Structure formats: C-alpha cells, structure tokens
Curated annotation (Swiss-Prot):
Source species taxonomy: Eukaryota, Metazoa, Chordata, Craniata, Vertebrata
Keyword entries, A-Z: Carbohydrate metabolism, Disulfide bond, Glucose metabolism, Hormone, Secreted
Oligomeric and partner information: Heterodimer of a B chain and an A chain linked by two disulfide bonds.
UniProt main location, coarse: secreted
Cellular component terms (Gene Ontology): extracellular space
GO MF entry, a single one: hormone activity
Organism: Katsuwonus pelamis
Known function: Insulin decreases blood glucose concentration. It increases cell permeability to monosaccharides, amino acids and fatty acids. It accelerates glycolysis, the pentose phosphate cycle, and glycogen synthesis in liver.
The protein's name in its UniProt record: Insulin
Gene that encodes it: ins
C-alpha cells in the first residue's frame, strides 16, 4: 500500500494513533514538509512522539 499524504487534521489524527499516550510534539513546519508535501511512513511519524 502506498503511504498517504497527511495534511492538517489528518496529520494530527495520525500522530494520535501512532503516539497514543506518549503524546507528540507538533512542529507544523517539519512534519508538514515530511508528510504533507510528500508521503511519510509510520516510522517518520514516530519521530514526532514524545
């Protein structure tokens, strides 16, 4: 399956799912470049978990 482009609220939702109770730090610029402009995978999302 292809990795989705995640933008805006979809991106935040994905972070909640991946990070769960650990929570995450939301850096719109960095993660937006990585996941909205081009597709990112679950491991890239995990980099933003606390």
């Amino acid at each position: 399956a292809a990795n989705p482009h995640l933008c805006g609220s979809h991106l935040v939702e994905a972070l909640y799912l991946v990070c769960g109770e650990r929570g995450f730090f939301y850096q719109p610029k960095g993660i937006h470049z990585z996941c909205c402009h081009k597709p990112c995978b679950i491991f890239z999302l995990z980099b933003y978990c606390n």
